Amino acid sequence: MAPWPPKGLVPAMLWGLSLFLNLPGPIWLQPSPPPQSSPPPQPHPCHTCRGLVDSFNKGLERTIRDNFGGGNTAWEEENLSKYKDSETRLVEVLEGVCSKSDFECHRLLELSEELVESWWFHKQQEAPDLFQWLCSDSLKLCCPAGTFGPSCLPCPGGTERPCGGYGQCEGEGTRGGSGHCDCQAGYGGEACGQCGLGYFEAERNASHLVCSACFGPCARCSGPEESNCLQCKKGWALHHLKCVDIDECGTEGANCGADQFCVNTEGSYECRDCAKACLGCMGAGPGRCKKCSPGYQQVGSKCLDVDECETEVCPGENKQCENTEGGYRCICAEGYKQMEGICVKEQIPESAGFFSEMTEDELVVLQQMFFGIIICALATLAAKGDLVFTAIFIGAVAAMTGYWLSERSDRVLEGFIKGR
């Protein structure tokens, strides 16, 4: 790691220049690497195989369309019979089956290319469905529709209408999954053949079931009206065929903390925090306190803040009291600041000059740089033959020489005295 810059103007300038010339630059200026994102989920092998077959079938359509259709029917029929099942066509189709970025498709095609060739030349007459022959029967990656799992078991509800047509059989068509039915809203049961909680049978026949919603708080009902409730949801009680809200705040059902109060809601309740002034409360605000918190006092029916600053609570010179909600704090008076537990008068700092932090050696270097620039400029003008600038140049050189000699003699004398 590069060192931090030294103090002082000139050393800092030289440090920055050295960093600029000594590449690469300081490492803290390099951008941090982007956060690592989790890899996307891999598709089920059956889905990859289905995609490969779908792309293969599209390739068959494309090759027929691209190679024939010129209008000469007799010529097309003669040549189509040769091209239809040719190796040339197979190669053309396979070249476009997988996109460049679909790694899973390329991997599966590499593993199954010999099987595809076998089907193309020997099996497609007896097994025209490539998906069934390749993905289900040969590779055993997929199952027929309405079945699931390693043994291709029927989904609940049967293979014709898995999950009764009102849900999704988990793993259907693949060699995985549990076969569990994920039912649509309003439907339930093992094969989604019943109405779920909060719904009733509006219509049913041998092949059709319609489930409609009960009235809001009803868990079970015989119809859509409030009076059709048979059982109520949690937080409600059945009373004269209607569901009535239970006030949990008036029962032991509410479980709020010591510094909270209960608020009843439809079918439930909420616990809300007491006011800061309260130690326990029966409702919102400082007027519903059971007891007052420290720093508060009972005034009428409310717990109000005690102004501790009315008494002498901040001993010490130049201190003053500041009242806060439920307490107070001692601060230094204006024009004073805290230092080691006492308040001392603030010293207004003198305004620092531009060169106030530079050392004597740094000032000498800066002066020499400045005079050097001036002399170079004057020398350039004097070289053009201007007598005025020539005189100024000679005078500046003489002045600089005298100044430098006097400064050097003072330093030599000072060093001699100090024994350097």
From Swiss-Prot:
<dbReference type="InterPro" id="IPR009030">
    <property type="entry name" value="Growth_fac_rcpt_cys_sf"/>
</dbReference>
<feature type="topological domain" description="Extracellular">
    <location>
        <begin position="406"/>
        <end position="420"/>
    </location>
</feature>
<feature type="short sequence motif" description="CXXC">
    <location>
        <begin position="278"/>
        <end position="281"/>
    </location>
</feature>
<dbReference type="Pfam" id="PF07645">
    <property type="entry name" value="EGF_CA"/>
</dbReference>
<keyword id="KW-0812">Transmembrane</keyword>
<dbReference type="InterPro" id="IPR006212">
    <property type="entry name" value="Furin_repeat"/>
</dbReference>
<feature type="short sequence motif" description="CXXC">
    <location>
        <begin position="46"/>
        <end position="49"/>
    </location>
</feature>
<dbReference type="GO" id="GO:0098978">
    <property type="term" value="C:glutamatergic synapse"/>
</dbReference>
<dbReference type="InterPro" id="IPR001881">
    <property type="entry name" value="EGF-like_Ca-bd_dom"/>
</dbReference>
<feature type="disulfide bond" description="Redox-active">
    <location>
        <begin position="46"/>
        <end position="49"/>
    </location>
</feature>
<feature type="transmembrane region" description="Helical">
    <location>
        <begin position="385"/>
        <end position="405"/>
    </location>
</feature>
<keyword id="KW-0676">Redox-active center</keyword>
<feature type="topological domain" description="Extracellular">
    <location>
        <begin position="30"/>
        <end position="362"/>
    </location>
</feature>
<feature type="domain" description="EGF-like 1">
    <location>
        <begin position="153"/>
        <end position="193"/>
    </location>
</feature>
<dbReference type="InterPro" id="IPR049883">
    <property type="entry name" value="NOTCH1_EGF-like"/>
</dbReference>
<dbReference type="GO" id="GO:0003197">
    <property type="term" value="P:endocardial cushion development"/>
</dbReference>
<keyword id="KW-0991">Intellectual disability</keyword>
<dbReference type="GO" id="GO:0003279">
    <property type="term" value="P:cardiac septum development"/>
</dbReference>
<feature type="repeat" description="FU 1">
    <location>
        <begin position="208"/>
        <end position="256"/>
    </location>
</feature>
<keyword id="KW-0413">Isomerase</keyword>
<dbReference type="GO" id="GO:0003756">
    <property type="term" value="F:protein disulfide isomerase activity"/>
</dbReference>
<dbReference type="InterPro" id="IPR000152">
    <property type="entry name" value="EGF-type_Asp/Asn_hydroxyl_site"/>
</dbReference>
<keyword id="KW-1015">Disulfide bond</keyword>
<protein>
    <recommendedName>
        <fullName>Protein disulfide isomerase CRELD1</fullName>
        <ecNumber>5.3.4.1</ecNumber>
    </recommendedName>
</protein>
<dbReference type="InterPro" id="IPR000742">
    <property type="entry name" value="EGF-like_dom"/>
</dbReference>
<feature type="disulfide bond">
    <location>
        <begin position="155"/>
        <end position="169"/>
    </location>
</feature>
<keyword id="KW-0887">Epilepsy</keyword>
<feature type="disulfide bond">
    <location>
        <begin position="314"/>
        <end position="330"/>
    </location>
</feature>
<keyword id="KW-0472">Membrane</keyword>
<dbReference type="InterPro" id="IPR018097">
    <property type="entry name" value="EGF_Ca-bd_CS"/>
</dbReference>
<comment type="function">
    <text>Protein disulfide isomerase. Promotes the localization of acetylcholine receptors (AChRs) to the plasma membrane.</text>
</comment>
<feature type="disulfide bond" description="Redox-active">
    <location>
        <begin position="278"/>
        <end position="281"/>
    </location>
</feature>
<dbReference type="GO" id="GO:0062023">
    <property type="term" value="C:collagen-containing extracellular matrix"/>
</dbReference>
<feature type="disulfide bond">
    <location>
        <begin position="163"/>
        <end position="181"/>
    </location>
</feature>
<feature type="glycosylation site" description="N-linked (GlcNAc...) asparagine">
    <location>
        <position position="79"/>
    </location>
</feature>
<dbReference type="Pfam" id="PF11938">
    <property type="entry name" value="DUF3456"/>
</dbReference>
<feature type="disulfide bond">
    <location>
        <begin position="183"/>
        <end position="192"/>
    </location>
</feature>
<comment type="similarity">
    <text>Belongs to the CRELD family.</text>
</comment>
<dbReference type="InterPro" id="IPR021852">
    <property type="entry name" value="DUF3456"/>
</dbReference>
<keyword id="KW-0325">Glycoprotein</keyword>
<feature type="transmembrane region" description="Helical">
    <location>
        <begin position="363"/>
        <end position="383"/>
    </location>
</feature>
<feature type="glycosylation site" description="N-linked (GlcNAc...) asparagine">
    <location>
        <position position="205"/>
    </location>
</feature>
